[in-house]
Amino acid sequence: MTNTRRSDFDVTNSVQVSSPKAVLAAVQALYRPTWPGMSLDPLTRAFAHFERLFAGEVPGYYGVDTVYHDRQHTLDITLALARLIVGYERQQEESARLGGARATIGLVTGLFHDVGYLRRADDHASQNGAEFTRTHVSRGARFLEEYLPVLGFGAWVPVASEIIHFTGYEVPFEHIEAKVADPRDIMVGHLLGTADMIAQMADRCYLEKCRDRLYAEFVLGGVAIPMNDGSPQVKYASGLDLLRQTPEFVSEVREKRLERDFRAAYHYLEILFGGSNPYMEAIDRNLDYLRQVLRSENWQLLRRRPPIFAATTDPMATMRGLMVGHIKRVWSGN
């Protein structure tokens, strides 16, 4: 194994997180000894459906066309979630353990947590999934309401369609916790929300992806230049401006989401890694490097160009064209 972390591998440089088959194998290796005798067929079926869905091979859906929230993004988070779930389970008394069914539902929810970015065939007004940035979690919840019964988990719909919102900003967390009765389900939600944050911030190319890809999605999603009383308000002026605000964002995520809202659940990883936490260490390295770049203003230090795992041809060129057109329309008032 190479010592240099590859751009589409996890924080340990051992699992190719652009590959559904590789991530499924890693999940199975974690789940089998933790819940011996439990059938992993639902997970196998879910991963197969995920692969077809994101490739645009499921009737009624277009494939993934978002450049930041691509296939690798989801799979990286899914692997982190599996590790968190298993790490948690191995440290609990029996009464607090999740059990195999809940662990499976949690992972399936994680696997499809960003499915709301996929355009449906009846989304006639949209040109790119990034346009659903503000509503993608609710769209994902509706997908789970349809898909979980097909997978044989219809009874879990009320839970899954709530805890998916721990990955977003559409529903206040206290509202979720008021509706979900079992504290073990809340814990799965906290593990899911934790995985969503730490895996992407630990990505080897997180900084370049924020500048080049996330900013473009934020433009199309109305986040970078939101409208206020019919007038555009600039939140992020450019990809570089987004990077300048990233240290503050990461600090806020760590303090408010990871530590407070999710009860420092990231520590459950440490039993799997001899007491260390490779995700948090990678986040620290990314932040240290970003501060170096910001001090020097030498943006050429961010020169990685990792592949995009989308279903469309040249998705970045398409995204840039849509972004430029959107910005022109915003400032022209059309």
Report residues per predicted region.
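Divalent metal-dependent phosphate-bond-processing catalytic cores, especially two-metal-ion Mg2+/Mn2+ enzymes
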Residues: 2-37, 83-102, 112, 169-334
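Non-transmembrane, amphipathic alpha-helical segments
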Residues: 35-38, 42, 66-69, 183
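Short alpha-helical scaffolding segments that buttress acidic/His motifs in well-ordered protein cores
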Residues: 46-50, 54, 106-110, 160-168, ...
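Active-site flanking loop/helix segments enriched in acidic
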Residues: 51-80, 122-130
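Secondary-structure capping and boundary motifs in well-ordered enzyme cores
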Residues: 69-73, 98-107, 132-136, 183-190
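Histidine- and acidic-residue-rich, metal-dependent catalytic cores
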Residues: 74, 81, 136-174, 232-233
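His-Asp-centered metal-binding catalytic motifs of divalent-metal-dependent phosphohydrolases/nucleases
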Residues: 77, 104-125, 140, 161-170
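Inter-helical turn/loop segments and adjacent helix faces that build the functional surface
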Residues: 88-96, 122-127, 147-159, 204
